Amino acid sequence: MLTGKEDLLQALVEAFIMEKGTKEFYAQAAAKSGSSDAKRTFGELSQWETTHMNYIQSLYQSILDDREMDEFAAFSKKAEAPLAEGGIPVKDLAKKIKSYTITNEKDALQIALTIEATSHALYKNLAAKAQATEAKVIFEEMMAQETTHMDQLNAMKKNIARK
């Protein structure tokens, strides 16, 4: 779990793992959703997290001048991701979708908003605690990306309400 005291490379690795955990959760939720709209929404959210993972990987590799490209690719496939964004255990999220059937897009969006808001709060806290300037910049960028996700999710909720 991130603390804000990591060096830049470690912060990127930890952030990557959390993004991967969230991506995997959204993919599982898509498979278990009770409606095609919820499946589509979770599938789209999973792709958002893939974009975050690619961003983090590109930063990591640019710092190392692409020296570890093959190693990072292997790491990304093998790395277990027990935590989702915000440090939420993936198993807790999985229990949430087991406890009730996600029957519509609104349910899917509400779960996603909770995850993204928790993630935003974590990255904000980490940016405030970061000892390395470079790590602070990364945490602030991740926080901004989570803000964008929350804005997009809220816009999607408004569109559903209009239907």
What do these predicted regions represent?
Residues 1-163:
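Non-heme di-metal
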